[in-house]
């Protein structure tokens, strides 16, 4: 397979992964602030769908293409910037896995509240808080990965 084509797919995939994460987080966070169960239920459904379509596929493709590229380019996975990129990716993925479950729970709570004409219950806010708390280290991890991939060095390493 052509090296440039795989690099292109790797960059495109990382863009989809990061863009989907930022976009869905933005919309779910701000619609949640309205406390409008009907609006939240609609947006949460789309967020869950986008996560499965874009995030799940790219979270599988990224390490596969990255390891292939490193091997093809003769880079050891213990090269500091590559090693720490992998660590950051593992952290981000470890945050994402419970986030998926939380998003489905947020969706279900909002759908139930909207269907019964009730407000979002306190359980929604608790789940949203956990979702936000997990999103922060994932975001920082992805920003660090982008830096290391471009600079080919570890930030703050001197």
List each model region and its residues:
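Polytopic transmembrane helical bundles with strong interfacial aromatic enrichment
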Residues: 1-158
